[in-house]
């Protein structure tokens, strides 16, 4: 069965795993999912990630992070969807929780946070909000 929105599936798996306090969650891997996982790790929202499995069906495994018994990711939300893509210029990129959260943006320079995109002066598709 084909999946219409693999990024939304990734975010839902993370949200569900953290609600039941799992230490790790796995999902089918793709280049965009690995790039999102790298941003989440760089920003301190997950412990680590790894791509495992055979060449035909790689699996992305995320090690989730908790602080004082609570998930570090309080809120994770898909913004741009297959039926309604959301593109923003460098000056129009949204700030999440007044800068306490991040917007993950897919730009021509790769997947990065809203802060990095603003610093580079590039806009792109707003994939999700994380706080």
Swiss-Prot record:
Top-level taxon of origin: Bacteria
A single GO cellular-component term on record: ribonucleoprotein complex
Pfam family, one: Ribosomal_S8
Listed InterPro entries: Ribosomal_uS8, Ribosomal_uS8_CS, Ribosomal_uS8_sf
A biological process term (GO) from this entry: translation
Any one GO molecular-function label of the UniProt entry: rRNA binding
Keyword Transmembrane helix carried by entry: no
PANTHER family: 40S RIBOSOMAL PROTEIN S15A
Function: One of the primary rRNA binding proteins, it binds directly to 16S rRNA central domain where it helps coordinate assembly of the platform of the 30S subunit.
Complex formation: Part of the 30S ribosomal subunit. Contacts proteins S5 and S12.
Protein name: Small ribosomal subunit protein uS8
Organism: Thiobacillus denitrificans (strain ATCC 25259 / T1)
């Amino acid at each position: 069965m084909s999946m219409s929105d693999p990024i939304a599936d990734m975010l839902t798996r993370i949200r569900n795993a953290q609600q039941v306090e799992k230490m790790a969650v796995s999902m089918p891997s793709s280049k965009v999912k690995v790039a999102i996982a790298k941003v989440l790790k760089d920003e301190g929202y997950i412990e680590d990630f790894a791509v495992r499995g055979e060449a035909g069906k790689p699996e992305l495994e995320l090690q989730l992070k908790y602080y004082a018994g609570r998930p570090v990711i309080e809120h994770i939300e898909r913004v741009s969807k297959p039926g309604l893509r959301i593109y923003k210029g460098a000056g129009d990129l949204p700030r999440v929780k007044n800068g306490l959260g991040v917007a993950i943006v897919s730009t021509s320079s790769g997947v990065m946070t809203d802060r990095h995109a603003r610093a580079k002066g590039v806009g792109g598709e707003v994939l999700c909000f994380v706080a």
